[in-house]
Amino acid sequence: MVDLQEKQCTIVKRNGMFVPFDRNRIFQALEAAFRDTRRIDDHMPLPEDLENSIRSITHQVVKEVVQKITDGQVVTVERIQDMVESQLYINGLQDVARDYVVYRDDRKAHREKSWQSLSVIRRCGTTVHFNPMKISAALEKAFRATDRIEGMTPDFVREEVNALTQKIVAEIEERCSQQDSRIDIEQIQDIVEQQLMVVGHYATAKNYILYREARARVRDNRVEDQIVEEAPSEETFEVLSKDGSTYMITHSQLLARLARACSRFPETTDAALLTDMAFSNFYSGIKESEVVLACIMAARANIEKEPDYAFVAAELLLDVVYKEALDRSRGDEDLEQVYRDHFKRYIMEGDSYRLNPELKNLFDLDALANAMDLSRDLQFSYMGIQNLYDRYFNHDDGRRLETPQIFWMRVAMGLALKEQDKTYWAITFYNLLSTFRYTPATPTLFNSGMRHSQLSSCYLSTVQDDLVNIYKVISDNAMLSKWAGGIGNDWTAIRATGALIKGTNGKSQGVIPFIKVTNDTAVAVNQGGKRKGAVCVYLEVWHLDYEDFLELRKNTGDDRRRAHDVNTASWIPDLFFKRLQQKGSWTLFSPDDVPGLHDAYGEEFERLYEEYERKVDSGEIRLYKKVEAEDLWRKMLSMLFETGHPWMTFKDPSNIRSAQDHTGVVRCSNLCTEILLNCSETETAVCNLGSVNLVQHILDDGLDEEKLSETISIAVRMLDNVIDINFYPTKEAKEANFAHRAIGLGVMGFQDALYKLDISYASQEAVEFADYSSELISYYAIQASCLLAKERGTYSSYKGSKWDRGLLPIDTIQLLANYRGKDNLQMDTSVRKDWEPIRSLIREHGMRNCQLMAIAPTATISNIIGVTQSIEPTYKHLFVKSNLSGEFTIPNVYLIEKLKKLGIWDADMLDDLKYFDGSLLEIERVPDHIKHIFLTAFEIEPEWILECASRRQKWIDMGQSLNLYLAQPDGKKLSNMYLTAWKKGLKTTYYLRSSSATTVEKSFVDINKRGIQPRWMKNKSASAGIVVERASKTPVCSLEEGCEVCQ
């Protein structure tokens, strides 16, 4: 049934004439296309399903046409064919759509070769095909504007437009016949104006002139007004699409695209600048992907000048994601509906894309689709989207299947699989994740909702002094690494070089060759093809092979006794530091001669160690080595500075303060030194990580405690769910995780939070903020675990734990003080909150998780959500970060905001930052109070970083990935730094940072202004006499920019 509104519609033909709209023409065109593609003869009836499809598509196109005409838009034959094409794709009829496109292209080529084809000479000298429809459209617009017409165009106007168009086209044809079928665009515009005035439409002529001057374009119906004045510099390039077809792109078209990407930042970004930069890299036949890349690179190049360009680049990359996953662009009107429909189709077809098959049956997909907030896609900066695109989005044969919100929802669904009300909790989890309040660790993001849901971050295992077990652990490493886990191995039990092997009566080669095999296994097995596998090997400092162990990462020496790819860490008992203080000796043993020593700690370790030393003196133990503690310490520090390894971790505080001291011993930490759990031959310790984003919980006057409480409650629930959903590559890992249910809740964006509060990291205020924020996180994490225990029950090994004995993390400091003595422990023990309600909850309900808190490095997830890593100070205010997704310029957005307010952010300031390697201290025009707030990592005295870490450690039941910074070689300062870390009660340390592998590009620094003679200058110049004194070059740690496994 054709309604009255449809009968009143008219469209513009290719000759520029208005004609009545006829839906039958659409039906007939579709029928012809179906018959041609499906090889159905004209005399044969169409199958019922095909006829229904044609009617449905016709109805959708008619509905869209009528709506646009009702809205006052001009609809052309070409636009209707675009709609038909779009509907064929939406309805999954790609084969018909493809043939229809080919048919249209053939017809277009035929028209352009016809006698009616005329050429228009543009101002830039290029020619384009003359299109009468554009004259009709421009005339109608002018009449509508003059007569203030709303809704459909009246018949008398259409008749006048048709008559005028015929006269204009006739005159153009007449002139072209005298000018070799070509006419200048100025002549066309003159003819239009002349004809309007000849017939007496003076007001319309005036509006048309204004219309031309304003260079208006009819964007809504995708018609470029050929009569509108063209820019003299307009260039055109042919672009090659992925499917092999080509199209033309102009400077103004690219400007329109980039203007949309810049529209959120009109005051700080310049679309014209980006257009010029991108267009300068174009060439005829440029690939479509290269067009996008040129635009993104133009935006990237300006990030150092204006951080908002990071969001412009992100929006451009988002368009790539949308086209790849949804076959849509960001500006498409139907994007939102296609987005939601694609999500539901993606989940329903998930079996083909490695998704967990349960997802499609256990959730209300309509509710989940409607819960997605697409505007949250715009929260990401460029580096965040690039990381997601490269490594996190699920893909099929190189094509991304996910967008940011679909990615978050897939993760949320995977974490809600064991909930009773799955849809409710999936939406709750999604809202927390997609607003950047909390982010799970990378393995969870990789694998949640997938068929193999290995979601755990960290695995800790101990190697027995047995060949079968040695290779079993190496094999386990491969399996764990395959599914994106980071691994810590304890190798202390392996007998030392020269020890007797009773079975063969031979001598052992020691632990080093086995670590070499471990190294090569880590290299061979990458993490699901997404990032490098990674292992950290631990050795206690009394092991006879320890001195060789120190040199594993050296670049010189016998390469058969080097392990360049694994990380190494020293497991140091307190007794070693006591001997160091006493300037005493230290004895190295083979583990098979000192049974029980590795499992002992505190006073028991001291008793056993001294007993074994007496056996050395009596001759009972013959394989040993005595060294001066100071000499060994000096070698430890030397290797740490030269190679960045072995990291220093502390055995006694890790065990004495462990909540699980009743079930075993902590023998090592994990890959990133924040996890401290028992492991044994029968148990591989497992921990699941996630981090709270402090930035999202900052108010003007401090932390939003209510919001933080809610975030932590939901986050702990997610982390606990991981344990039950997880895919376990080994039996030992599964048994340990189910028995103890350890989770590691951490933080990120600590430095950003300080910036928002105008606090310097090197201040007592920062120390107090570290203390208070950690206390709140500890308080609400313990509370959440208690409430989960009430709902789900305690973990199975709860009985006898410190929790069960009424000891909270804050209480265990006294246990450590009792063993060490007050001179060797300098930890604050003050509290702000009333902890009695938490103690009461534990007594009543117990705990769901044996351990709760650990601060991971968050190297990758902090990049995704755009905050500073973990608890790290700002590295530099302008630097280049390298990871598997490439190199990214990282400016300090908080600093730039401050400098803008002071009116001193300009090209010279950027030049200064580059010249001074991202530091403010030597830039005279920066006020001192700004310099103090914005100290970089190497400018902050280590005491501040260590005191902040100590305040956190009093509340944390595990550890923290704590990097330390040393700007210049200074053995005494380095020694004091690590001795202070021990005395402050820290359990572990992480990297020692001495310098960076990547720096900011300085090729544009003004050497004349700096007064420096470049090396290539052969002749003596006025600047040749300048003496530039530079600090001696420090050794460069062969470190990566950040941990790429835990987070």
UniProtKB/Swiss-Prot annotation:
Gene3D superfamilies linked: 3.20.70.20
Residues annotated as site: Important for electron transfer: Y990, Y991
Annotated PROSITE patterns: ATP_CONE, RIBORED_LARGE
Site location (Important for hydrogen atom transfer): C458, C687
Cysteines engaged in disulfide bonds, as pairs: C458-C687
GO MF annotation terms: ATP binding; ribonucleoside-diphosphate reductase activity, thioredoxin disulfide as acceptor
Record has Transmembrane as a keyword: no
Keywords: Allosteric enzyme, ATP-binding, Deoxyribonucleotide synthesis, Disulfide bond, Nucleotide-binding, Oxidoreductase, Repeat
Activation and inhibition: Under complex allosteric control mediated by deoxynucleoside triphosphates and ATP binding. The type of nucleotide bound at the specificity site determines substrate preference. It seems probable that ATP makes the enzyme reduce CDP and UDP, dGTP favors ADP reduction and dTTP favors GDP reduction.
Similarity comment: Belongs to the ribonucleoside diphosphate reductase large chain family.
Record NCBIfam families: NrdE_NrdA, PRK07207.1, PRK12365.1
Subunit comment: Tetramer of two alpha and two beta subunits.
Stated role: Provides the precursors necessary for DNA synthesis. Catalyzes the biosynthesis of deoxyribonucleotides from the corresponding ribonucleotides.
Protein name listed in UniProt: Ribonucleoside-diphosphate reductase subunit alpha
Organism name: Chlamydia muridarum (strain MoPn / Nigg)
